[in-house]
A protein has these predicted regions:
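N-terminal start-of-chain detector that recognizes signal peptides
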Residues: 1, 62, 71, 220-221
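Alpha-helical transmembrane segments of integral membrane proteins
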Residues: 2-9, 34-38
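Helix-termination/interfacial motifs at the ends of transmembrane alpha-helices
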Residues: 5-8, 12-27, 145-148, 152-232
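Large intracellular
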Residues: 19-163, 235-288
Length: 288
């Protein structure tokens, strides 16, 4: 919602101010299609050159994430803590043998299937199961496990940030591409140097539309979208760190309740359930 409001404000203020200042939209309307084809087409081509197919798909998905916002909400954080509580409690009370059935086939696990949204995220499931699998193989050094988890998180986060970096790269190039379009317009104008001043003025005005479009697209649309996507990715990345915090706390010998409380402390403030809310969720999950 807010990105759409922001776009409306950007367009309204820029073009509304131009209109109130007595600007003539005919020049913009007449020149914009060709200028946009040159600038937008060149920017798209540069994006294709600098990315492989997976990268381009990521950029496409990233644009939709700009509009939809972070993937994980307050309930999802609560569900994640409840899931980790049940798994660590099972491991603590019944041992690794009872846990193996859940981590080897999470799609058939009664515990995992309580949380369908979490199960749809392959990284969440794989990250939890792979780490617990390491624990069942007697890798119980908290520092080694934490180091291994941190490397997985860094790799995943680096890959997740690629669409934002690609969009930012496009934004950085748009002003220069706008200048390219403007220069081509000036070249065209110089070929008609014998025309009367009013004709030359119109042609120069059309050429400058290219500079305007390049800067406007860069700083009014694409750049802010890249910043928003970066913020969304960073916020979603906090979700996966909760898994690390809870499982490392469990390896340090803490009870399941204490481990998830440590994880709750790492939840972003706007998403953080209260102690009472989490306790109620854990009780409900255990009884289910």
């Amino acid at each position: 919602m807010f990105p759409i409001i922001g776009l409306v404000v950007v367009f309204g203020m820029v073009f509304g101010g131009f209109m109130l200042a007595g600007g003539h939209f005919e020049v913009l309307i007449e020149a914009a299609p060709m200028e946009f084809m040159m600038i937008g087409g060149a920017a798209l081509g540069a994006l294709i050159i600098s990315n492989d197919l997976n990268g381009l798909k990521g950029v496409g998905g990233g644009v939709s994430r700009v509009m939809s916002g972070p993937k994980w909400g307050k309930k999802d954080y609560q569900d994640l803590l409840s899931l980790l509580f049940q798994l660590t409690k099972l491991m603590k009370t019944k041992g690794v043998v009872a846990l193996e059935a859940h981590i080897e086939k999470p799609n058939e696990s009664a515990i995992f299937q309580k949380y369908p949204k979490l199960c749809k995220d392959h990284f969440v499931v794989d990250f939890i199961c792979d780490t617990l699998r390491m624990m069942t193989m007697n890798l119980d050094d908290p520092h080694q496990v934490e180091d291994a988890m941190e490397k997985q998180l860094e790799k995943h986060h680096h890959e997740a940030l690629h669409p934002a970096h690609a969009l930012q790269g496009m934004a950085d190039g748009l002003p220069a591409l706008g200048i390219v379009a403007a220069v081509l317009g000036i070249v065209k104008t110089m070929g008609a140097i014998n025309e009367p001043p009013e004709v030359l003025g119109l042609m120069i005005g059309k050429a400058l539309v290219g500079t305007f479009l390049g800067v406007f697209l860069a700083y009014g649309i694409v750049g802010p979208m890249a910043s928003r996507l970066n913020a969304v990715t960073e916020q979603d990345g906090q979700f996966y760190k909760i898994i690390r915090d809870v499982l490392v706390a469990h390896l340090h010998g803490n009870a399941a309740q204490v481990s998830v409380e440590i994880g709750r402390g790492s939840v972003p403030s706007v998403m953080q359930p209260t102690f009472a809310q989490l306790e109620e969720a854990l009780t409900t999950a255990t009884e289910a």
